Amino acid sequence: MPYKRITLTHFLLQEQRRLGGSGSFTALMTDIIFACKMISHEVNRGALAGNLGVAGSENVQGEEQKKLDVLANDIFLHMNALGGSYAGMASEELEDVHAVHGAADGKYLLLFDPLDGSSNIDVNISVGSIFSILKLPEGANAGSKDAFLQPGVKQVAAGYALYGSSTMLVLTTGNGVNGFTLDNNVGMFLLTHPNMTIPADTKEFAINASRERFWEPPVKRYIDECRQGKEGPRGKDFNMRWVASMVAEVHRILCRGGVFLYPADTENMKKGGKLRLMYEANPMAFIVEQAGGAATTGRGRMMEVPPTGLHQRVPVILGSKEEVERIGAYHAEYDAKK
């Protein structure tokens, strides 16, 4: 019964008491919760509200924006500026930082991908929002990108909202991972997935196989071994998954194990990779590590990568710890022979 479940707000208050906090973190999370509820509503309305299709514009990445990309970005900016907890924000959709006017006392910075996987939205496949929270460094200017360029290990919290058959918000504050499901009847996120842990054993991998011709040898080696199944060196059959929505991929891995790869390849290597360090890789790495998994570029721990720009791209390999470590070892062996 819903009334017997812990609400996300109550959960945050419990965390606040445990840590002896002032309440400012609970307040800023409340803003994110409202933003995710509003985006969920707009995603669910879809074609009924004229929300599908392209917006006729491009984002800073040079990617065509969907109508819901623009709407979700506006919702995140507006809702999270109201509370005054954030000194500044940065979005995957914006070229520069977004200073929050009238938030002189703001102690935190918010980075977000307002609508991950939006290429799927017109065909009704799950999409999501990803967010990362950092502390504003002492004496830093929240209007400068330098304040945001902190490695992933500096994150205070990270999470994502998944807009699928139900809407979920998955969150870590550095004390494990918990999942909350939106009950539309009462308008609240309720704790449904406490202490989420990635299973150690896995028989699934997620990769865009259409890019195989661009892969580096260590990635080819790993995928080839998985494909060989019981007859190969792994001694078991694997299944391949690919949704083209990072939130959906990571959520599946949190629930039943697996590994997600968007590796460096010969086509994207000059850009550093495909996915964005600050908006996608770091928050997901924090969540995955807190759930007992691992996240790497293939050549180092994701959350230790020094950021050089707001829109820096990196290779991403994350999921079940043993699989991620195996892929990292294959990269090390390959590099040692070059």
From Swiss-Prot:
SUPFAM superfamilies: Carbohydrate phosphatase. It comes from the Bacteria. Pathway: Carbohydrate biosynthesis; gluconeogenesis. The keyword Magnesium applies. The gene is fbp. One of its GO terms (molecular function) is magnesium ion binding. CDD domains: FBPase. InterPro entries: FBPase_C_dom (IPR044015), FBPase_class-1 (IPR000146), FBPase_N (IPR033391), FBPtase (IPR028343). Keywords: Carbohydrate metabolism, Cytoplasm, Hydrolase, Magnesium, Metal-binding. Belongs to the FBPase class 1 family. Homotetramer. It holds the Pfam family FBPase. It is found in: Cytoplasm. It comes from Paramagnetospirillum magneticum (strain ATCC 700264 / AMB-1). This is Fructose-1,6-bisphosphatase class 1. One of its GO terms (biological process) is fructose 6-phosphate metabolic process. Its main location: cytoplasm. Substrate binds at D116, G117, S118, S119, N208, K274.
